[in-house]
Amino acid sequence: MKIFKEIPTQKPITPILDGINLPSDIRSLSLGELESLANEIREFLLYSVGQSGGHLGGGLGVIELTIILHYIFNTPFDNLVWDVGHQAYPHKILTGRKNKMQTIRKKGGLAPFPSRKESEFDAFGVGHSSTSISAMLGMAIATKESNPEKKHIAVIGDGAMTAGMAFEALSHTGHLKPNVLIILNDNDMSISENVGGLSNYFSRIWASKTYKGIKKSGASFLKPLPQAYHLA
């Protein structure tokens, strides 16, 4: 992964990205080319959003994930729903909008979030957070009979998972068992600290002497098993 110490002020050279206009174009790339594409998108995103303004962190954190989702799934036939709209900048770049990325937040320019009016690849008009699983579930139920082979994917972050709407949708999804995939982007990041009874309850558990003792004992027990010990 290429490391950037500052926002590029000149348009980067992106030979692979220049040839990508739709997700179908990336499905013929080799693994090495996909890795190079990720680096090119990263630099291009820094440059373009650096010109227009916007939220970089969410998009920068899902570049490889965005590439692989569009590589594996047949978008836009398969529905891809992004939970926090700022994560969708790489998605916009790969779905025919890279030449307009500098217009984000400008009059007549691209929306800062996915918009169904903007592209057929935007399956849902995303707001800020916690709506993706509900939206994906509704799509899956609606197409269960007419398009049973259609797949539905939601990408949600650990911060968005603290909302009640996400928990309710998870519960309903587990009951109905539709043809869906939920990806948890657990990056330990959120705009503000978690609040609420559930968060406080688990915080007390994780900070308790009992929990710490159990964790320490479990880690010692698993030490002969390197892979399990790492998880502990």
Residue ranges of model-derived segments:
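N-terminal amphipathic, basic-rich helices that act as targeting or association modules
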Residues: 1-95
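Long, well-ordered, tryptophan-enriched scaffold segments
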Residues: 2-11, 188-232
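Gly-rich Lys/Arg/Thr-decorated short loops/hinges at beta-loop-alpha junctions or inter-strand turns
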Residues: 15-22, 43-48, 111-123, 221-232
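Hydrophobic alpha-helical scaffolding
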Residues: 27, 55-58, 128, 159-163, ...
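Generic secondary-structure signature for well-ordered alpha-helical cores
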Residues: 39-50, 74, 106-109, 141-144, ...
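Cofactor-binding active-site loop characterized by glycine-rich and histidine/acidic residues
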Residues: 55-176
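Generic beta-strand/beta-sheet core signal
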Residues: 83, 153-156, 181-185, 192
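A short alpha/beta connector and helix-capping loop motif
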Residues: 163-187, 195, 201-207
